[in-house]
């Protein structure tokens, strides 16, 4: 997944990050997922990273985005996407938001990945996704 995350994040930065100096820090880790998990995982990452470039740096013109994927144990996958941008506006409950992108991301995490998505708002925004790795089918790096 490392190569895909790297390509995706750099592509989204070129599309949405013009006029801003956003540093991408990707923590490499060899994580293999089945295709049935790699596809929804890629869709979720696309939405989260797009949202960062569209919304996290409205007030700031520079910042940092950190993306990591790891396996804290042999069957658990942990993905973290963190920015030091403006943060989620006070009083905004992202769980009740009706925006299609974030709603889709939550559905893919809970429905297809059978995982959890947690959001922290502290000096920017950090989203953590955790799910159990499946053993079905061919693995995608």
Regions found by a protein language model. Give the residues of each.
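Short beta-to-alpha transition helix within the HATPase_c
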Residues: 1-15, 70
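Glycine-rich/acidic phosphate-handling loop/turn and adjacent ATP-lid/helix
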Residues: 74-103
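Glycine-rich nucleotide-binding loop
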Residues: 87, 122-128
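A short, conserved alpha-helix near the extreme C-terminus of the histidine kinase catalytic
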Residues: 103-111
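Conserved short strand/loop->alpha-helix "switch" segment adjacent to the catalytic nucleotide/phosphoryl-transfer site
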Residues: 16-49, 53-65
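C-terminal end segment of the histidine kinase catalytic
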Residues: 129-141
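Glycine-rich ATP-binding loops of the HATPase_c
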Residues: 112-120
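Short beta-strand/loop element within the Bergerat-fold HATPase_c
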Residues: 62-75
């Amino acid at each position: 997944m490392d190569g895909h995350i790297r390509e995706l994040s750099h592509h989204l930065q070129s599309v949405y990050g013009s006029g801003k100096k956003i540093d991408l820090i990707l923590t490499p880790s060899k994580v293999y997922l089945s295709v049935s998990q790699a596809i929804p995982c890629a869709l979720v990452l696309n939405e989260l990273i797009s949202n960062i470039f569209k919304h996290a740096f409205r007030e700031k013109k520079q910042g940092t985005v950190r993306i990591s994927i790891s396996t804290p144990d042999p069957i658990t996958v942990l993905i973290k996407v963190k920015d030091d941008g403006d943060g989620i506006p006070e009083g905004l409950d992202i769980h009740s938001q009706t925006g299609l992108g974030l709603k889709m991301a939550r559905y893919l995490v809970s429905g297809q990945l059978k995982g959890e998505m947690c959001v922290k708002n502290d000096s920017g925004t950090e989203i953590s996704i955790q799910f159990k790795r499946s053993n079905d089918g061919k693995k995608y790096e």
